């Protein structure tokens, strides 16, 4: 994110979860010295655990900043139409119901301001009460597009689907180090028919993360434990 560049913030410590992420911060876009950027893990990850698992599918798309000021522009965008169609997909809703799954829609805070524009099926639960971590811990399957919530969810080794039907997402910097197709923790899907088929496959297999993606999780995160806060505390104390 460009807002943490040195001449904007001049931070004393930047935390990363992966050596690859750390390497990306060492580029010229940020201008920090290497000792400032540490791969210690995120303290918030310590609260992630697969407890109180429920049969629920979590839908959490990213936001499009350029649609912020106009309801008309939002409602007529490919981004909105694709999401609205998903939230009204009769095949998905019916299959989830048959399998005993609830579908939870957790809109981005900015998108929540426009929730009245959606034609929401009565079986879709719009969550405005639970924290992100509560939903991550409880849910069995995540559907997002480009959102960083996939990192939190994949830390638990639960399946992620990147539904990237709209290619209008604006990355903060010109090129991200993270390639969704080769590094992502789940399938990258463009078409709604393919998405529904894949979701049904996951529900048929109790939402078990596939081995190829478990391997990617293991390769990406330097640590997969609940000692992130301790590592950060120790580093601050020693420095």
Residue positions per predicted region:
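Donor nucleotide-activated moiety binding/catalytic core segment of transferases
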Residues: 109-151
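Short, solvent-exposed loop/turn segments at secondary-structure junctions
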Residues: 19-22, 43-45, 62-66, 109-112, ...
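Acidic, amphipathic alpha-helical patches
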Residues: 4, 92, 132
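Active-site and donor-binding regions of nucleotide-sugar-utilizing enzymes
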Residues: 1-47
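C-terminal alpha-helical cap of glycosyltransferases
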Residues: 225-239
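Catalytic binding pocket for nucleotide-activated donors in carbohydrate/polymer assembly enzymes
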Residues: 32-33, 119, 148-220
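A short beta-strand/loop micro-motif in the catalytic core of glycosyltransferases
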Residues: 12-18, 102-104, 142-143
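Conserved catalytic-core segment of nucleotide-activated headgroup transferases in glycan assembly
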Residues: 38-116, 189-191
């Amino acid at each position: 994110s460009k807002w943490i560049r040195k001449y904007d913030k001049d931070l004393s410590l930047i935390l990363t979860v992966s050596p690859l992420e750390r390497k990306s911060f060492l580029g010229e876009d940020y201008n920090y010295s290497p000792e400032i950027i540490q791969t210690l893990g995120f303290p918030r990850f310590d609260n992630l655990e697969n407890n109180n698992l429920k049969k629920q599918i979590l839908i959490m798309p990213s936001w499009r900043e350029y649609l912020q000021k106009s309801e008309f522009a939002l409602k007529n965008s490919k981004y909105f139409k694709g999401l609205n169609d998903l939230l009204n997909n009769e095949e998905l809703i019916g299959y989830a119901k048959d399998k005993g799954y609830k579908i939870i829609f957790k809109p981005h805070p900015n998108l929540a301001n426009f929730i009245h524009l959606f034609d929401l099926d009565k079986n879709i639960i719009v969550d405005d009460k639970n924290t992100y971590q509560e939903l991550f811990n409880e849910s069995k399957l995540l559907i997002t597009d480009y959102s960083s919530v996939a990192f939190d969810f994949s830390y638990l080794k639960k399946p992620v689907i990147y539904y990237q039907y709209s290619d209008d997402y604006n990355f903060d910097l010109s090129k991200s180090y993270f390639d969704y197709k080769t590094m992502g923790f789940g399938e990258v899907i463009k078409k709604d028919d393919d998405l529904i088929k894949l979701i049904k496959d996951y529900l048929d297999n109790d939402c078990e993360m596939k081995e190829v993606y478990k391997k990617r999780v293991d390769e990406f995160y330097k640590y997969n434990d609940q000692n992130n806060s301790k590592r950060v505390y120790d580093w601050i104390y020693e420095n």
